[in-house]
């Protein structure tokens, strides 16, 4: 499937006895569609979703990596499961966001509406709207905190909202959307940034704005960006 200048890859896989489709969204774009049960899915740049063409009679299970946002169709007889990076999220009908990129140190599950239960090893974490489960892959264990859901899912609406975010977190988000490699100096990575990035604007526009509001310099050379 062609999406702009990028190739959206879809293929069949075999995770269980059922055949699964694998939808791979490349960098510099996102994708949305509705699954066979009516669940709406938004898939961010550099992300993958594995899902069956038709769900089983007793449950609905998908596998994800990267970042996805789901509005799960209600079905009391068939709970919906999302398996991602060692976490299994169970819902009946709700809206939530998952961020689990392989090259990032944290996996985040954020609930917007409804109620979900996230299973990590032998422990279950129940989330209510506005709560985020954060699992650090390197240091410490899972933790739950209060967040602004509008900020978390702003990427589905054509822009990114950053509120007091570390510049390293900003870079992690923008590198996937713009398809570039962003390297920050040790001093720049911990700078706190607040602002809105329109996904339609060029990367150079953001870099110029960043230089104006922060004490940093930016050097862009093709697909390589250095911030120091």
Regions found by a protein language model. Name each.
Residues 1-228:
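A residue-level detector for the "anchor" residue at the start of short, highly conserved motifs
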